[in-house]
């Protein structure tokens, strides 16, 4: 799949860091683990060897996945974005029409989404409903749990922390 996908500069740094760690640390470590397990004799009944080979397969698969992702990434520097309309990278504060509670979300790429840090994927129902809206607009968000209505209170573009 050659489709580009948006990612923040910080998110891209995180992917690159994981890729370098897997290639230069984990790959060497697992090779040493496999060599050590081989020294224990019969490989057909060597659980240590099998576990190390499985871990190696996982690491190699993740390396390929990360290489593909970094090749397809379209890096967007949120610090250089501005405007009143909500788009990728926006930090959006909303008021829930039902509860009057204020909630803030940051719209990021799908590989950066982390609801515990209020980072929602650009492909999520809330982000899809918010894209193109601006302060004062009302949005209706349909989720698996039902429909929610929000008012957009602020739209900001600021650098993310890792």
Swiss-Prot record:
One Pfam short name: GreA_GreB_N
Domain of life: Bacteria
InterPro entries according to UniProt: GreA/GreB_C_sf (IPR036953), TF_GreA/GreB_CS (IPR018151), Tscrpt_elong_fac_GreA (IPR006359), Tscrpt_elong_fac_GreA/B (IPR028624), Tscrpt_elong_fac_GreA/B_C (IPR001437), Tscrpt_elong_fac_GreA/B_fam (IPR023459), Tscrpt_elong_fac_GreA/B_N (IPR022691), Tscrpt_elong_fac_GreA/B_N_sf (IPR036805)
GO MF term (any one): RNA polymerase binding
UniProt record, GO biological process: DNA-templated transcription elongation; regulation of DNA-templated transcription elongation
Record-annotated disulphide pairs: none
Keywords, comma-separated and alphabetical: Coiled coil, DNA-binding, Transcription, Transcription regulation
Protein name in UniProt: Transcription elongation factor GreA
Biological function: Necessary for efficient RNA polymerase transcription elongation past template-encoded arresting sites. The arresting sites in DNA have the property of trapping a certain fraction of elongating RNA polymerases that pass through, resulting in locked ternary complexes. Cleavage of the nascent transcript by cleavage factors such as GreA or GreB allows the resumption of elongation from the new 3'terminus. GreA releases sequences of 2 to 3 nucleotides.
Family from the record: Belongs to the GreA/GreB family.
Coiled-coil regions, chain positions: 45-74
